[in-house]
């Protein structure tokens, strides 16, 4: 029974750091502005639909405030894109 041993050669490289190059790269990064890669959700109109069913709403006497019962759903956000894409988000 024999063993085969192999040693892989690893290459080591050194990079000389130049502060002038670093400053140039940093300034270039600060000046550039990132534009959106897509126009998706750029022209979004949100419509919030509230549950106004009085059956799900309990008014607290004397305070003028109210609370929703446990069976009431939260608000629904309906999003319609100008390109026709529609989404519904139930909170």
UniProtKB/Swiss-Prot annotation:
Gene: C2orf15
Name the record gives this protein: Uncharacterized protein C2orf15
Species of origin: Homo sapiens (Human)
Gene Ontology MF terms: RNA binding
Classification of source organism: Eukaryota, Metazoa, Chordata, Craniata, Vertebrata
């Amino acid at each position: 029974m024999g063993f085969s041993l192999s040693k892989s050669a690893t290459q080591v490289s050194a990079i000389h750091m130049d502060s002038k190059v670093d400053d140039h790269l940093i300034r270039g990064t600060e000046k550039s502005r990132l534009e959106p890669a897509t126009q998706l959700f750029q022209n979004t109109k949100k419509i919030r639909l509230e549950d106004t069913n009085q059956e799900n709403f309990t008014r607290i006497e004397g305070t003028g405030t109210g609370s929703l019962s446990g069976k009431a759903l939260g608000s629904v956000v309906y999003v319609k894109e100008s390109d026709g894409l529609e989404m519904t988000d139930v909170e």
